[in-house]
UniProtKB/Swiss-Prot annotation:
Top-rank taxon: Bacteria
Xref: InterPro entries: Restrct_endonuc-II-like, tRNA_endonuc-like_dom_sf, UPF0102_YraN-like
Name by which UniProt lists this protein: UPF0102 protein NT01CX_2205
Pfam families reported in the protein's UniProt record: UPF0102
Similarity annotation: Belongs to the UPF0102 family.
CDD domains reported in the protein's UniProt record: PoNe_Nuclease
């Protein structure tokens, strides 16, 4: 059985990357991974390093996308961000943790974006 979650997530990350660039963000890295976890998009914007989690869905049958960013997921993102900050020596920077929710239209190429700055 084919798992559609990965291509849907990748498509959502692509949409999110374009959205952030259109808002003036400079993409530093995508899908940063370490033992602690993964961060979908890391960007810089207005003297902030922004760590962005992307959640993409076709509908709300499993709740709104940001509800899947649980306390456990937040801890993993924070620990991964700490590691990124450490290895890149970014100690003097300001930081933001954002969430982008994307709802795709199953029948067309339309989608809606909800950008939640300083989500946690």
């Amino acid at each position: 059985m084919y798992n559609f979650n990965k291509p849907i997530g990748s498509y959502g990350e692509h949409i999110s990357e374009n959205f952030l660039v259109s808002k003036g963000h400079k993409i530093l890295t995508k899908n940063f991974r370490c033992r602690s976890g993964e961060i979908d998009i890391i960007s810089s914007h207005n003297n902030y390093i922004c760590f962005t989690e992307v959640k993409t869905r076709y509908n709300y049958s499993f709740g709104i996308p940001c509800e899947s960013v649980t306390i456990t997921k937040i801890k993993k993102i924070r620990n991964t961000a700490k590691f990124y900050i450490y290895i890149n020596k970014l100690f003097k920077n300001n930081f933001k943790f954002n969430v982008i929710e994307i709802i795709l239209n199953k029948y067309s190429n339309d989608y809606s974006i909800n950008f939640i700055e300083n989500a946690f």
